[in-house]
């Protein structure tokens, strides 16, 4: 996924597409597959992985990596240094899996507020790129490209998170309905 950057012919929009695919497509898919694979792990390992999936830590790590890589000199550095670029992608994927785990990896009653709190983080980066009247990264020379990259990040991350939000709200409502029926039928 890094050839366009190292060749010097890439666009920020293409680079942003890589990030969106890693965090908003690949990571959720890995979580959906991963939760099914947990049953094949030794019980202790599976429990440890579930415990490490702390929602506040996952949210914080994902937000911190997103903001730090886009609003510090790290982004320019990563474009010029392949090892840093690979580290950047690894951090995006790992923190995104960590972020998505509470929402997709198990039923969690706080999924709706968790997603609502995460949406602005992605939106801020997208809006800053979209609305800036100056180039934010040395490697890229087109303000129009930067604006497209910002729109791509803002729109796609908002769309994916909104879809996840609808799913989480629906799942929560179904669970509440089941609990209400159980209370009515069994007096619990």
Please name every model-derived segment.
Residues 1-188:
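Alpha-helical membrane segments of multi-pass proteins
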């Amino acid at each position: 996924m890094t050839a366009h950057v190292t060749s010097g012919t890439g666009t920020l929009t293409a680079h942003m597409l890589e990030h969106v695919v890693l965090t908003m497509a690949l990571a959720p898919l890995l979580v959906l597959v991963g939760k099914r694979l947990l049953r094949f792990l030794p019980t202790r390992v599976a429990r440890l992985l579930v415990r490490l999936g702390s929602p506040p830590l996952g949210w914080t790590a994902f937000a911190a990596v997103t903001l730090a890589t886009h609003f510090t000199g790290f982004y320019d550095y990563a474009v010029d240094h392949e090892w840093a670029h690979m580290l950047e992608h690894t951090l995006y994927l790992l923190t995104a899996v960590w972020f998505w785990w509470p929402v997709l990896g198990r039923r969690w009653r706080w999924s709706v507020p968790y997603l609502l709190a995460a949406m602005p983080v992605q939106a801020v980066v997208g809006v800053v790129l979209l609305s800036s009247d100056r180039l934010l990264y040395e490697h890229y020379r087109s303000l129009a490209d930067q604006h497209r990259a910002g729109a791509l990040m803002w729109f796609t991350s908002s769309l994916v998170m909104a879809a996840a939000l609808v799913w989480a709200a629906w799942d929560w409502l179904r669970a509440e309905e089941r609990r209400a029926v159980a209370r009515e039928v069994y007096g619990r």
